[in-house]
Amino acid sequence: MTPPAARRRSQFIDAVIDDYAAVHSTPPDPHQLELQRITREKTGGAAGMQIGDDQAMLMEMLVRAMGATRAVEIGTFTGYSALAVARGLGPGGRLLCCDISQEWTSIARAAWQEAGVANRIELRVGPGLETLRALPPGEQFDFAFIDADKTGYAQYYEEVLTRLRPGGLILLDNTLQGGHVVGDLPDDEDVAAIRFLNDAIASDPRVKVVLI
């Protein structure tokens, strides 16, 4: 059973229901719990950027179910989402992680090593868009996760989509912006960027979309 305090609560689901869902889901293992602890200890208020247990498990299951062997992540933070994706990859699978922070990704590197997935992950520190554009022509991905600066989402999406294999999957985090996408925050750049992207993807004939 996962202690409720270890979870990142949904902003849209009653706390009692959220706790019920946690009890009836596979809990995080010791490696994940330790990474959560270290992230809270080392990053302070920034720890809220870490995805929740339920999302991590869902990502691992999706990657495994689709038989993905090549994945990319834009925005790695302390490596919790990457740990989930790496665990779901098929034999010989590789995950490319892109992040701009040496400090936060040093936590990720140690966690991946401890969890036994470091050999599946390549970390490149630098602007994500530059990293993607520097990849060899024709390099494709089965799965992509975008969780970086919101004003850059549209460019990340386009760059990743051109490298996504037919039937591949792109996950974008924070696409509801805490519900503010339907609110009135005209001066918030992040919300405006996500609204723009949501509208663009919803009308993009190249993809099928679900926003949850």
Regions picked out by a protein language model, each given a short descriptive name:
Residues M1-F143, K150-L171, T175-I212:
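A short alpha-helical cap/connector motif
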